[in-house]
Amino acid sequence: YTVIAVPALVYAVGAYGFFALPYTILVYPIVFLIMPKLWKVAHAKGHVTAADAVYGRYGSRPLEFAVALTGVVATMPYIALQLIGMEVVIKALGLTGELPLAAAFVILALYTYSAGLRAPALIAFVKDIMIYIVVLVAVVLVPAKLGGYGAVFAHAHDAFAVKGGATGLTLKPAQFLPFATLAIGSALAAFMYPHTLTGIFAARSADTIRKNAVFLPAYTVLLGLIALLGFMAYAAGISVKNNNDVVPALFNALFPSWFTGFAFSAIAIGALVPAAVMSIGAANLFTRNFWKPYVAPDITAAGQEKVAKVVSLIVKAGALIFILFLPTKFALDLQLLGGVWIVQTFPSVVFGLFNISNRFRAPALLAGWAAGMIGGSWLAFADGIKPVHTFVIGGGSYAIYTGLTALIFNVVVAVVVQLLLGKRGEETPALRQSAG
Protein backbone atom coordinates (compact mmCIF):
# COMPACT_ATOMS: atom_id res chain seq x y z
CA TYR A 1 0.00 0.00 0.00
CA THR A 2 2.50 2.59 1.18
CA VAL A 3 5.52 1.99 -1.04
CA ILE A 4 3.95 0.63 -4.24
CA ALA A 5 0.24 1.48 -4.57
CA VAL A 6 0.16 5.10 -3.35
CA PRO A 7 3.17 6.30 -5.43
CA ALA A 8 1.72 4.45 -8.42
CA LEU A 9 -1.56 6.34 -8.11
CA VAL A 10 0.26 9.67 -7.65
CA TYR A 11 2.36 8.90 -10.73
CA ALA A 12 -0.79 8.23 -12.73
CA VAL A 13 -3.12 11.03 -11.63
CA GLY A 14 -1.15 13.48 -9.48
CA ALA A 15 -2.70 15.27 -6.50
CA TYR A 16 -5.80 13.05 -6.46
CA GLY A 17 -3.60 10.18 -5.28
CA PHE A 18 -2.79 12.06 -2.09
CA PHE A 19 -6.23 11.29 -0.59
CA ALA A 20 -4.34 8.73 1.50
CA LEU A 21 -2.86 11.56 3.57
CA PRO A 22 -6.09 13.11 4.93
CA TYR A 23 -7.41 9.56 5.31
CA THR A 24 -4.58 8.67 7.69
CA ILE A 25 -5.03 11.99 9.50
CA LEU A 26 -8.73 11.26 10.06
CA VAL A 27 -7.93 7.78 11.37
CA TYR A 28 -6.13 9.11 14.44
CA PRO A 29 -9.08 10.71 16.26
CA ILE A 30 -11.07 7.55 15.52
CA VAL A 31 -8.37 5.46 17.16
CA PHE A 32 -8.00 7.90 20.05
CA LEU A 33 -11.71 8.28 20.84
CA ILE A 34 -13.38 5.03 19.78
CA MET A 35 -10.86 2.23 20.07
CA PRO A 36 -10.18 2.64 23.83
CA LYS A 37 -13.91 2.19 24.44
CA LEU A 38 -13.89 -0.96 22.33
CA TRP A 39 -10.86 -2.26 24.23
CA LYS A 40 -12.55 -1.70 27.60
CA VAL A 41 -15.64 -3.64 26.54
CA ALA A 42 -13.55 -6.42 25.00
CA HIS A 43 -11.28 -6.66 28.05
CA ALA A 44 -14.21 -6.83 30.46
CA LYS A 45 -16.14 -9.43 28.47
CA GLY A 46 -13.26 -11.49 27.04
CA HIS A 47 -13.89 -10.53 23.42
CA VAL A 48 -11.07 -11.05 20.92
CA THR A 49 -12.84 -10.23 17.64
CA ALA A 50 -15.27 -7.60 16.39
CA ALA A 51 -17.91 -10.30 15.97
CA ASP A 52 -17.46 -11.25 19.64
CA ALA A 53 -18.15 -7.66 20.65
CA VAL A 54 -21.23 -7.47 18.44
CA TYR A 55 -22.67 -10.71 19.81
CA GLY A 56 -21.91 -9.64 23.37
CA ARG A 57 -23.76 -6.36 22.83
CA TYR A 58 -26.78 -7.49 20.82
CA GLY A 59 -27.02 -11.23 21.51
CA SER A 60 -27.63 -11.95 17.82
CA ARG A 61 -25.89 -14.88 16.12
CA PRO A 62 -26.94 -13.73 12.62
CA LEU A 63 -25.44 -10.27 13.20
CA GLU A 64 -22.29 -11.85 14.64
CA PHE A 65 -21.99 -14.06 11.55
CA ALA A 66 -22.55 -11.09 9.23
CA VAL A 67 -19.68 -9.17 10.85
CA ALA A 68 -17.40 -12.22 10.74
CA LEU A 69 -18.21 -13.00 7.10
CA THR A 70 -17.60 -9.39 6.10
CA GLY A 71 -14.23 -9.39 7.81
CA VAL A 72 -13.11 -12.48 5.92
CA VAL A 73 -14.35 -11.34 2.51
CA ALA A 74 -13.12 -7.75 2.83
CA THR A 75 -9.65 -8.91 3.79
CA MET A 76 -9.16 -10.80 0.52
CA PRO A 77 -8.76 -7.79 -1.81
CA TYR A 78 -6.54 -6.13 0.80
CA ILE A 79 -4.25 -9.17 0.76
CA ALA A 80 -4.42 -9.05 -3.04
CA LEU A 81 -2.89 -5.58 -2.86
CA GLN A 82 0.01 -6.98 -0.82
CA LEU A 83 0.49 -9.80 -3.33
CA ILE A 84 0.73 -7.22 -6.11
CA GLY A 85 3.43 -5.42 -4.13
CA MET A 86 5.44 -8.64 -3.92
CA GLU A 87 4.72 -9.42 -7.56
CA VAL A 88 6.11 -6.15 -8.95
CA VAL A 89 9.33 -6.55 -6.96
CA ILE A 90 9.82 -10.13 -8.16
CA LYS A 91 9.06 -8.97 -11.71
CA ALA A 92 11.68 -6.24 -11.39
CA LEU A 93 14.22 -8.97 -10.62
CA GLY A 94 13.67 -10.46 -14.07
CA LEU A 95 10.84 -12.99 -13.87
CA THR A 96 8.17 -12.59 -16.54
CA GLY A 97 4.59 -13.64 -17.28
CA GLU A 98 2.58 -15.06 -14.39
CA LEU A 99 5.66 -16.36 -12.56
CA PRO A 100 6.04 -13.30 -10.28
CA LEU A 101 2.46 -13.58 -9.03
CA ALA A 102 2.75 -17.34 -8.60
CA ALA A 103 5.98 -16.90 -6.67
CA ALA A 104 4.43 -14.24 -4.43
CA PHE A 105 1.47 -16.52 -3.62
CA VAL A 106 3.65 -19.55 -2.84
CA ILE A 107 5.97 -17.51 -0.61
CA LEU A 108 3.03 -16.08 1.35
CA ALA A 109 1.30 -19.46 1.69
CA LEU A 110 4.40 -21.29 2.91
CA TYR A 111 5.41 -18.39 5.15
CA THR A 112 2.28 -18.53 7.29
CA TYR A 113 1.10 -22.15 7.01
CA SER A 114 3.98 -23.64 8.97
CA ALA A 115 4.64 -20.98 11.61
CA GLY A 116 1.35 -19.07 11.85
CA LEU A 117 1.44 -15.70 13.59
CA ARG A 118 4.93 -16.38 14.95
CA ALA A 119 6.41 -15.92 11.48
CA PRO A 120 5.40 -12.27 10.92
CA ALA A 121 6.00 -11.46 14.59
CA LEU A 122 9.61 -12.61 14.35
CA ILE A 123 10.54 -10.34 11.45
CA ALA A 124 8.17 -7.40 11.93
CA PHE A 125 10.86 -5.34 13.65
CA VAL A 126 13.41 -6.13 10.92
CA LYS A 127 10.83 -5.21 8.30
CA ASP A 128 10.19 -1.82 9.90
CA ILE A 129 13.91 -1.00 10.11
CA MET A 130 14.48 -1.97 6.47
CA ILE A 131 11.52 0.06 5.24
CA TYR A 132 12.60 3.15 7.21
CA ILE A 133 16.12 2.91 5.78
CA VAL A 134 14.83 2.63 2.21
CA VAL A 135 12.35 5.48 2.62
CA LEU A 136 14.84 7.85 4.26
CA VAL A 137 17.45 7.17 1.60
CA ALA A 138 14.87 7.56 -1.17
CA VAL A 139 13.37 10.86 -0.01
CA VAL A 140 16.80 12.41 0.61
CA LEU A 141 19.07 11.04 -2.11
CA VAL A 142 16.61 10.73 -5.00
CA PRO A 143 15.63 14.45 -5.03
CA ALA A 144 19.31 15.37 -4.59
CA LYS A 145 20.20 13.37 -7.69
CA LEU A 146 17.32 14.94 -9.63
CA GLY A 147 18.10 18.58 -8.82
CA GLY A 148 15.99 19.04 -5.69
CA TYR A 149 12.27 19.05 -5.00
CA GLY A 150 11.77 22.15 -7.14
CA ALA A 151 12.98 20.26 -10.19
CA VAL A 152 10.87 17.24 -9.22
CA PHE A 153 7.66 19.29 -9.10
CA ALA A 154 8.57 21.12 -12.32
CA HIS A 155 9.03 17.87 -14.24
CA ALA A 156 5.83 16.42 -12.79
CA HIS A 157 3.91 19.58 -13.73
CA ASP A 158 5.13 19.38 -17.32
CA ALA A 159 4.29 15.68 -17.55
CA PHE A 160 0.75 16.17 -16.27
CA ALA A 161 0.27 19.12 -18.65
CA VAL A 162 1.03 16.75 -21.51
CA LYS A 163 -1.27 14.06 -20.10
CA GLY A 164 -4.15 16.48 -19.61
CA GLY A 165 -7.48 15.35 -18.21
CA ALA A 166 -7.98 15.04 -14.46
CA THR A 167 -4.27 15.02 -13.63
CA GLY A 168 -2.01 17.66 -12.13
CA LEU A 169 -0.22 18.91 -9.05
CA THR A 170 -3.46 20.33 -7.65
CA LEU A 171 -7.01 19.01 -7.52
CA LYS A 172 -9.55 19.90 -10.16
CA PRO A 173 -12.89 21.21 -8.79
CA ALA A 174 -14.63 18.00 -9.87
CA GLN A 175 -12.20 16.02 -7.72
CA PHE A 176 -12.94 17.81 -4.44
CA LEU A 177 -15.92 15.64 -3.46
CA PRO A 178 -14.50 12.24 -4.42
CA PHE A 179 -11.18 13.15 -2.78
CA ALA A 180 -12.95 14.05 0.48
CA THR A 181 -15.28 11.05 0.50
CA LEU A 182 -12.43 8.64 -0.27
CA ALA A 183 -10.57 10.02 2.73
CA ILE A 184 -13.59 9.89 5.07
CA GLY A 185 -14.76 6.44 3.98
CA SER A 186 -11.27 4.96 4.16
CA ALA A 187 -10.75 6.40 7.65
CA LEU A 188 -13.99 4.84 8.92
CA ALA A 189 -13.01 1.49 7.40
CA ALA A 190 -9.37 1.34 8.49
CA PHE A 191 -9.81 -0.06 11.99
CA MET A 192 -12.72 -2.36 11.20
CA TYR A 193 -10.46 -4.96 9.55
CA PRO A 194 -9.71 -8.12 11.57
CA HIS A 195 -5.95 -7.54 11.53
CA THR A 196 -6.16 -3.94 12.78
CA LEU A 197 -8.65 -4.85 15.50
CA THR A 198 -6.36 -7.68 16.58
CA GLY A 199 -3.82 -5.02 17.54
CA ILE A 200 -6.48 -3.11 19.46
CA PHE A 201 -7.68 -6.15 21.41
CA ALA A 202 -4.08 -7.17 22.17
CA ALA A 203 -3.16 -3.78 23.66
CA ARG A 204 -2.17 -3.68 27.33
CA SER A 205 -4.66 -0.96 28.20
CA ALA A 206 -6.90 1.74 26.79
CA ASP A 207 -4.23 4.30 27.66
CA THR A 208 -1.71 2.37 25.55
CA ILE A 209 -3.99 2.79 22.55
CA ARG A 210 -4.30 6.52 23.16
CA LYS A 211 -0.54 6.95 23.63
CA ASN A 212 0.18 5.10 20.39
CA ALA A 213 -2.41 7.20 18.56
CA VAL A 214 -0.55 10.35 19.57
CA PHE A 215 2.52 9.23 17.63
CA LEU A 216 0.65 7.95 14.58
CA PRO A 217 0.69 11.29 12.68
CA ALA A 218 4.39 10.67 12.03
CA TYR A 219 3.24 7.96 9.63
CA THR A 220 1.30 10.56 7.63
CA VAL A 221 4.47 12.58 7.10
CA LEU A 222 6.30 9.45 6.00
CA LEU A 223 3.46 8.47 3.66
CA GLY A 224 3.48 11.92 2.06
CA LEU A 225 7.20 11.67 1.36
CA ILE A 226 6.81 8.18 -0.10
CA ALA A 227 3.92 9.32 -2.30
CA LEU A 228 6.25 11.93 -3.82
CA LEU A 229 8.19 9.06 -5.40
CA GLY A 230 5.46 9.15 -8.04
CA PHE A 231 6.50 12.71 -8.95
CA MET A 232 10.21 11.84 -8.74
CA ALA A 233 9.74 9.22 -11.43
CA TYR A 234 8.92 11.96 -13.95
CA ALA A 235 12.04 13.90 -13.02
CA ALA A 236 14.08 10.72 -13.53
CA GLY A 237 12.54 10.14 -16.96
CA ILE A 238 10.87 6.90 -15.88
CA SER A 239 8.20 5.52 -18.20
CA VAL A 240 6.33 2.31 -17.38
CA LYS A 241 3.44 0.43 -18.97
CA ASN A 242 2.05 -0.59 -15.58
CA ASN A 243 1.82 2.16 -12.96
CA ASN A 244 2.63 -0.35 -10.21
CA ASP A 245 6.15 -0.76 -11.63
CA VAL A 246 7.11 2.89 -11.13
CA VAL A 247 8.91 2.62 -7.76
CA PRO A 248 10.98 -0.47 -8.68
CA ALA A 249 11.87 1.20 -12.00
CA LEU A 250 12.92 4.38 -10.16
CA PHE A 251 15.13 2.45 -7.75
CA ASN A 252 16.66 0.42 -10.58
CA ALA A 253 17.53 3.63 -12.41
CA LEU A 254 19.03 5.64 -9.54
CA PHE A 255 20.43 3.26 -6.93
CA PRO A 256 23.47 0.97 -7.09
CA SER A 257 22.56 -2.67 -7.56
CA TRP A 258 23.36 -3.66 -3.96
CA PHE A 259 21.00 -1.05 -2.49
CA THR A 260 18.34 -1.79 -5.10
CA GLY A 261 18.40 -5.40 -3.92
CA PHE A 262 18.09 -4.25 -0.32
CA ALA A 263 15.19 -1.95 -1.23
CA PHE A 264 13.37 -4.71 -3.13
CA SER A 265 13.81 -7.04 -0.16
CA ALA A 266 12.37 -4.39 2.15
CA ILE A 267 9.35 -3.85 -0.10
CA ALA A 268 8.71 -7.58 -0.44
CA ILE A 269 8.96 -8.18 3.31
CA GLY A 270 6.89 -5.05 3.89
CA ALA A 271 4.11 -6.67 1.86
CA LEU A 272 4.62 -10.18 3.20
CA VAL A 273 4.26 -9.38 6.90
CA PRO A 274 0.92 -7.49 6.75
CA ALA A 275 -0.48 -10.01 4.26
CA ALA A 276 0.35 -12.81 6.69
CA VAL A 277 -1.23 -10.98 9.62
CA MET A 278 -4.33 -10.19 7.54
CA SER A 279 -4.88 -13.79 6.47
CA ILE A 280 -4.37 -15.11 10.00
CA GLY A 281 -6.69 -12.48 11.47
CA ALA A 282 -9.43 -13.35 8.98
CA ALA A 283 -8.95 -17.07 9.60
CA ASN A 284 -9.21 -16.68 13.37
CA LEU A 285 -12.36 -14.60 12.93
CA PHE A 286 -13.95 -17.33 10.80
CA THR A 287 -12.90 -20.12 13.17
CA ARG A 288 -14.08 -18.39 16.34
CA ASN A 289 -17.30 -16.82 15.10
CA PHE A 290 -18.53 -19.32 12.54
CA TRP A 291 -16.83 -22.69 12.78
CA LYS A 292 -17.01 -23.03 16.56
CA PRO A 293 -20.60 -21.83 17.17
CA TYR A 294 -22.17 -23.39 14.07
CA VAL A 295 -20.09 -26.42 13.05
CA ALA A 296 -18.04 -27.74 15.97
CA PRO A 297 -19.06 -26.26 19.34
CA ASP A 298 -16.79 -28.67 21.23
CA ILE A 299 -13.70 -28.05 19.13
CA THR A 300 -10.42 -27.88 21.05
CA ALA A 301 -7.85 -25.11 20.83
CA ALA A 302 -5.64 -27.39 18.74
CA GLY A 303 -8.57 -28.10 16.45
CA GLN A 304 -9.26 -24.41 16.03
CA GLU A 305 -5.63 -23.88 15.07
CA LYS A 306 -5.85 -26.55 12.37
CA VAL A 307 -9.06 -25.05 10.95
CA ALA A 308 -7.55 -21.56 11.02
CA LYS A 309 -4.53 -22.74 9.02
CA VAL A 310 -6.77 -24.14 6.28
CA VAL A 311 -8.98 -21.05 6.23
CA SER A 312 -5.90 -18.81 6.10
CA LEU A 313 -4.81 -20.65 2.97
CA ILE A 314 -8.30 -20.29 1.47
CA VAL A 315 -8.26 -16.55 2.18
CA LYS A 316 -4.94 -16.23 0.34
CA ALA A 317 -6.37 -18.19 -2.58
CA GLY A 318 -9.33 -15.82 -2.58
CA ALA A 319 -6.93 -12.89 -2.77
CA LEU A 320 -5.25 -14.51 -5.77
CA ILE A 321 -8.65 -14.91 -7.45
CA PHE A 322 -9.32 -11.19 -7.00
CA ILE A 323 -6.11 -10.40 -8.88
CA LEU A 324 -6.72 -12.91 -11.68
CA PHE A 325 -10.41 -12.35 -12.32
CA LEU A 326 -11.07 -8.80 -11.11
CA PRO A 327 -8.37 -6.72 -12.78
CA THR A 328 -8.42 -3.10 -11.65
CA LYS A 329 -6.94 0.03 -13.17
CA PHE A 330 -4.98 0.78 -10.00
CA ALA A 331 -3.77 -1.63 -7.32
CA LEU A 332 -5.21 0.70 -4.69
CA ASP A 333 -8.70 -0.01 -6.04
CA LEU A 334 -8.49 -3.48 -4.48
CA GLN A 335 -8.00 -2.05 -1.01
CA LEU A 336 -10.80 0.43 -1.61
CA LEU A 337 -13.08 -2.44 -2.65
CA GLY A 338 -12.35 -4.13 0.65
CA GLY A 339 -13.19 -0.83 2.31
CA VAL A 340 -16.62 -0.81 0.64
CA TRP A 341 -17.43 -4.04 2.46
CA ILE A 342 -15.68 -3.71 5.82
CA VAL A 343 -17.08 -0.23 6.53
CA GLN A 344 -20.57 -1.81 6.56
CA THR A 345 -19.66 -3.32 9.94
CA PHE A 346 -19.02 0.12 11.43
CA PRO A 347 -22.59 0.66 12.75
CA SER A 348 -22.76 -2.77 14.39
CA VAL A 349 -19.32 -2.49 15.99
CA VAL A 350 -19.22 1.20 16.93
CA PHE A 351 -22.83 2.11 17.71
CA GLY A 352 -22.74 -0.51 20.46
CA LEU A 353 -20.07 1.47 22.29
CA PHE A 354 -22.27 4.53 22.74
CA ASN A 355 -25.80 5.27 23.88
CA ILE A 356 -26.88 5.31 20.25
CA SER A 357 -26.92 1.51 20.43
CA ASN A 358 -30.02 1.71 22.63
CA ARG A 359 -31.89 3.09 19.63
CA PHE A 360 -31.01 0.14 17.39
CA ARG A 361 -31.84 -3.53 17.70
CA ALA A 362 -30.04 -6.36 15.97
CA PRO A 363 -32.63 -6.89 13.18
CA ALA A 364 -32.34 -3.23 12.16
CA LEU A 365 -28.54 -3.33 12.10
CA LEU A 366 -28.60 -6.61 10.18
CA ALA A 367 -30.98 -5.15 7.60
CA GLY A 368 -28.75 -2.10 7.26
CA TRP A 369 -25.68 -4.30 6.85
CA ALA A 370 -27.38 -6.34 4.11
CA ALA A 371 -28.50 -3.19 2.30
CA GLY A 372 -25.03 -1.67 2.47
CA MET A 373 -23.31 -4.86 1.33
CA ILE A 374 -25.67 -5.48 -1.57
CA GLY A 375 -25.85 -1.84 -2.65
CA GLY A 376 -22.11 -1.25 -2.32
CA SER A 377 -21.23 -4.45 -4.18
CA TRP A 378 -23.66 -3.67 -6.98
CA LEU A 379 -22.30 -0.16 -7.46
CA ALA A 380 -18.68 -1.33 -7.31
CA PHE A 381 -19.11 -4.08 -9.88
CA ALA A 382 -21.40 -1.99 -12.09
CA ASP A 383 -18.65 0.64 -12.23
CA GLY A 384 -15.97 -1.90 -13.12
CA ILE A 385 -14.44 -2.07 -9.61
CA LYS A 386 -13.86 1.67 -9.64
CA PRO A 387 -13.98 3.07 -6.10
CA VAL A 388 -16.10 6.12 -6.92
CA HIS A 389 -19.68 6.23 -8.23
CA THR A 390 -21.05 9.31 -9.97
CA PHE A 391 -24.60 10.40 -9.23
CA VAL A 392 -26.37 12.78 -11.61
CA ILE A 393 -28.82 14.92 -9.65
CA GLY A 394 -30.57 18.00 -10.99
CA GLY A 395 -28.19 18.29 -13.89
CA GLY A 396 -25.12 18.15 -11.65
CA SER A 397 -22.64 15.29 -11.24
CA TYR A 398 -21.52 14.17 -7.79
CA ALA A 399 -18.77 11.55 -7.48
CA ILE A 400 -18.71 9.83 -4.08
CA TYR A 401 -16.70 6.93 -2.70
CA THR A 402 -18.85 3.83 -3.07
CA GLY A 403 -18.05 2.65 0.45
CA LEU A 404 -19.37 5.86 2.00
CA THR A 405 -22.46 5.79 -0.22
CA ALA A 406 -23.19 2.23 0.87
CA LEU A 407 -22.62 3.14 4.53
CA ILE A 408 -25.14 5.97 4.29
CA PHE A 409 -27.60 3.53 2.70
CA ASN A 410 -26.80 1.09 5.51
CA VAL A 411 -27.61 3.57 8.28
CA VAL A 412 -30.75 4.86 6.55
CA VAL A 413 -32.14 1.33 6.15
CA ALA A 414 -31.27 0.53 9.77
CA VAL A 415 -33.16 3.62 10.94
CA VAL A 416 -36.19 2.80 8.78
CA VAL A 417 -36.32 -0.82 9.93
CA GLN A 418 -35.95 0.25 13.55
CA LEU A 419 -38.87 2.65 13.12
CA LEU A 420 -40.92 -0.13 11.57
CA LEU A 421 -40.09 -2.39 14.49
CA GLY A 422 -41.40 0.27 16.82
CA LYS A 423 -39.57 2.01 19.58
CA ARG A 424 -36.81 0.37 21.53
CA GLY A 425 -39.10 -2.26 22.95
CA GLU A 426 -37.77 -5.12 25.02
CA GLU A 427 -34.01 -5.43 25.19
CA THR A 428 -32.33 -8.76 24.69
CA PRO A 429 -30.70 -10.15 27.84
CA ALA A 430 -27.28 -9.57 26.31
CA LEU A 431 -28.11 -5.95 25.52
CA ARG A 432 -29.53 -5.30 28.97
CA GLN A 433 -26.52 -6.89 30.66
CA SER A 434 -24.09 -4.93 28.48
CA ALA A 435 -25.88 -1.67 29.17
CA GLY A 436 -25.70 -2.33 32.87
Which ranges hold each PLM region?
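Membrane-embedded helix-loop-helix hairpins and adjacent transmembrane boundary segments
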Residues: 1-436
